[in-house]
Swiss-Prot record:
It comes from Pyrococcus abyssi (strain GE5 / Orsay). It comes from the Archaea. This is UPF0166 protein PYRAB06660. Belongs to the UPF0166 family. InterPro entries: N-reg_PII-like_a/b, N-reg_PII/ATP_PRibTrfase_C, UPF0166.
């Protein structure tokens, strides 16, 4: 049985296009680099193989329908206050996209030292 404790963690998702840019570099790279500089717990970039956005135009990795602007999703899970800071920094970088934030429960997988540090930080955060 797994014990679940609320650690005030949030999941941030950033939906952008593969061709979106920030200061001459791919936007997804600029965002991940900024998150890393901020000390965010981690970020993962997913490249969509098929989808559409608000303009209802299909984007596909299919050879017969090769799109040069596939959907990109950047996903981050961290403590609530870190996600809030990240959103405030990233929002001005996005000209055409979407940001979502939702509560999530972390069932931590890691070393005992990492888990203990995470728990201590979460307890201190509640005070």
């Amino acid at each position: 049985m797994v014990e679940v404790e609320h650690w005030n963690t949030l999941r941030l998702r950033i939906y952008i296009g593969e061709n979106d840019r920030w200061e001459g570099k791919p936007l997804y790279k600029a965002i991940v680099e900024k998150l890393r500089e901020m000390g965010i717990a981690g970020a993962t970039v997913y490249r969509g193989i098929y989808g559409f956005g608000k303009k209802s135009r299909i984007h596909s990795s299919d050879v017969l329908r090769l799109s040069t602007d596939l959907p990109i999703v950047i996903e981050v899970v961290d403590r609530g206050h870190n996600i809030e800071k990240a959103v405030n920094v990233i929002k001005p970088m996005i000209k055409d996209g979407m940001i979502t934030v939702e509560p999530t429960i972390v069932l931590w997988v890691g070393s005992k030292e990492e888990i203990k540090k995470f728990e201590e930080d979460a307890i201190a955060e509640r005070r």
